[in-house]
Amino acid sequence: MTASQEPVDQAPESNEPAPAVPATVEALQAELAAVRAELEAAQATVAGQQEQVLRARADAENVRRRAQEDVSKARKFGIESFAESLVPVKDSLEAALAQPDQTLEALREGVEVTLKQLTGAFERNLLKEIAPAQGDKFDPHLHQAISSVPSDQPANTVAQLLQKGYAIADRTLRPALVIVSAGQA
């Protein structure tokens, strides 16, 4: 045979070792059993993880539902303290109206006592008056300017208070209505 007549299907020689091939059926069955055991372990892990995810979702849903219930209760009963503070004020007004033949002075004293009760109720519930004095700097977060007038007061200060405002804690419920100074005429 010459070099041109050699069979073509022979693979070129390689220095790499041939892949390890299991020699027996028993070895293949042992390897298959090991792979099946790994698969079962992985499936058990996945099932456990899925169970944990379902529990976490259920817990999150329970927390969300409880939070909604708490918010609903807070809205419903949030003014309970304030309402309790106002009941004595209403009682005083009703008692004053029930008195026959009151003098103007007695009526005035009753209104003053009732105003003190109402002011106390406001204070207990953090409702504060916004009543800027003449000459206080105009604050658009606390005051509402109705007009601007020439005044002896410096510009952008309160020239006159028309109506008190109110705030709960640091939140303005109603700004004070004021006339603002435009400065010297």
Curated annotation (Swiss-Prot):
GO terms for molecular function: adenyl-nucleotide exchange factor activity; protein homodimerization activity; protein-folding chaperone binding; unfolded protein binding. One of its GO terms (biological process) is protein folding. InterPro entries: GrpE, GrpE_coiled_coil, GrpE_head. Gene3D superfamilies: 3.90.20.20, Head domain of nucleotide exchange factor GrpE (2.30.22.10). Pfam families: GrpE. Residues 1-22 are annotated as: Disordered. One of its GO terms (cellular component) is cytosol. It is found in: Cytoplasm. Keywords: Chaperone, Cytoplasm, Stress response. Its main location: cytoplasm. NCBIfam families: PRK14139.1 (NF010737), PRK14140.1 (NF010738), PRK14150.1 (NF010748). Participates actively in the response to hyperosmotic and heat shock by preventing the aggregation of stress-denatured proteins, in association with DnaK and GrpE. It is the nucleotide exchange factor for DnaK and may function as a thermosensor. Unfolded proteins bind initially to DnaJ; upon interaction with the DnaJ-bound protein, DnaK hydrolyzes its bound ATP, resulting in the formation of a stable complex. GrpE releases ADP from DnaK; ATP binding to DnaK triggers the release of the substrate protein, thus completing the reaction cycle. Homodimer. Belongs to the GrpE family. This is Protein GrpE. It comes from Bordetella petrii (strain ATCC BAA-461 / DSM 12804 / CCUG 43448).
